[in-house]
């Protein structure tokens, strides 16, 4: 659930706890696939992942906990993109989120760890590299080559920045 406490006000008497209802608010993502097998534990794991992902896209990009978090972390996106895009048609969500990543690249090619990004904090390669992995997975899952074409200049600029911190193809200490 996305709340810890509920305050009910302006009542003349306390309600019967059984009469209080909470409603699930979630994004109505189009289902891309389903899963069911003979192992009830695997089915329950799938259902928990499904429920979680369904509730994490309320702001137009995936977050780790929508009741608290308002930023789309690249690391969280990297951890969940393959599963999320397999379960749901998230092409519109990723189009929006990749636009946000495109908007936050800095003049020197560095990127923050979230998009949108309301402050100056930076991020490591796993977070910033989301512009590449999300573009690639979105193309692979939905077959839209324009995603790669649109974000290729941003990817190039970021990789140019990464190159400044690489020796023989390996990253050295990240700034």
Task: Annotate the PLM regions.
Residues 1-7, 11-175:
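Substrate-binding groove/exosite segments of carbohydrate-active enzymes
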């Amino acid at each position: 659930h996305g709340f810890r406490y509920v305050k009910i006000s302006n009542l003349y008497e306390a309600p019967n706890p059984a009469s209080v209802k909470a409603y699930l608010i979630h994004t109505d993502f189009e289902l891309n696939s389903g899963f069911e097998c003979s192992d009830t534990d695997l089915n329950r794991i799938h259902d928990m992942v499904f429920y979680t992902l369904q509730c994490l896209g309320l702001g137009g990009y995936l977050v780790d906990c929508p009741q608290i978090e308002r930023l789309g972390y690249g690391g969280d996106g990297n951890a969940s993109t393959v599963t999320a895009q397999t379960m749901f048609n998230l092409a519109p969500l990723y189009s929006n989120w990749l636009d946000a990543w495109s908007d936050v690249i800095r003049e020197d090619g560095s990127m923050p760890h979230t998009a949108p990004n309301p402050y100056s904090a930076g991020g490591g390669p796993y977070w910033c590299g989301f512009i590449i992995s999300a573009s690639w997975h979105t193309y692979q899952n939905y077959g839209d080559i324009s995603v790669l074409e649109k974000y290729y200049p941003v990817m190039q600029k970021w990789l140019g920045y990464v190159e400044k911190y690489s020796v023989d193809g390996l990253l050295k200490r990240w700034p």
